[in-house]
Swiss-Prot record:
Listed GO MF terms: rRNA binding; structural constituent of ribosome
UniProt superkingdom: Bacteria
Pfam families: Ribosomal_L9_C (PF03948), Ribosomal_L9_N (PF01281)
Gene Ontology CC terms: ribonucleoprotein complex; ribosome
Name of this chain's protein: Large ribosomal subunit protein bL9
Family: Belongs to the bacterial ribosomal protein bL9 family.
NCBIfam families for this protein: L9 (TIGR00158)
GO BP term (any one): translation
InterPro entries: Ribosomal_bL9 (IPR000244), Ribosomal_bL9/RNase_H1_N (IPR009027), Ribosomal_bL9_bac/chp (IPR020594), Ribosomal_bL9_C (IPR020069), Ribosomal_bL9_C_sf (IPR036791), Ribosomal_bL9_N (IPR020070), Ribosomal_bL9_N_sf (IPR036935)
UniProt-listed Gene3D superfamilies: Ribosomal protein L9, C-terminal domain, Ribosomal protein L9, N-terminal domain
Species name: Pseudomonas fluorescens (strain Pf0-1)
Protein keywords: Ribonucleoprotein, Ribosomal protein, RNA-binding, rRNA-binding
Primary role: Binds to the 23S rRNA.
Length: 148
């Protein structure tokens, strides 16, 4: 399935690229979320007319993400959780908890932007958490988990 990308997609292409993707990925993700359009002659012409507008919108999103990344770089978030004697938490700290703590600190972060590659946090301590704000912008936040 050939599509024209309407925004930068990680590991796929940039705005305006004509890409070949599997039909399911195109129909179930890229097209419904407005990230791409079918690569027909009419859509190519319409895209070229809107190219400047789309590039400006993409630049605005990236600038916004970079400003949020600068704010996040300065933050250190402390989360309190109940823990046992050896520092093992009763439960865990997930992406939702971290996103809520960052939002409470003054920087709006969605749960889907927080990346925990090793799974949820289950121990007391300091952790560096990646926050993926844009396809080209990622920030690292120090999260301190303390026992209640």
């Amino acid at each position: 399935m050939q599509l024209i990308l309407l925004e930068k997609i990680a590991n796929l292409g940039n705005l305006g690229d004509k890409v070949n993707v599997k039909a399911g990925y195109g129909r179930n993700y890229l097209l419904p979320f407005g990230k791409a359009t079918a690569a027909t002659a009419a859509n190519l012409a319409a895209f070229e007319e809107r190219r400047a507008e789309l590039e400006k919108a993409a630049a605005d999103r990236k600038a916004s993400a970079e400003s949020r990344a600068a704010q996040l770089a300065e933050l250190e978030v402390t989360i309190t959780a109940t823990a046992g004697d050896e520092g093992k938490l009763f439960g865990s700290i997930g992406t939702h908890d971290i996103a809520d703590a960052l939002t409470a600190s003054g920087v709006e972060v969605a749960k889907s932007e927080v990346r925990l590659p090793n799974g949820t946090i289950r121990n007391v301590g300091e952790f560096d958490v990646a926050v993926h704000l844009h396809a080209e912008v990622e920030a690292t936040v120090r999260v301190v988990v303390v026992a209640a």
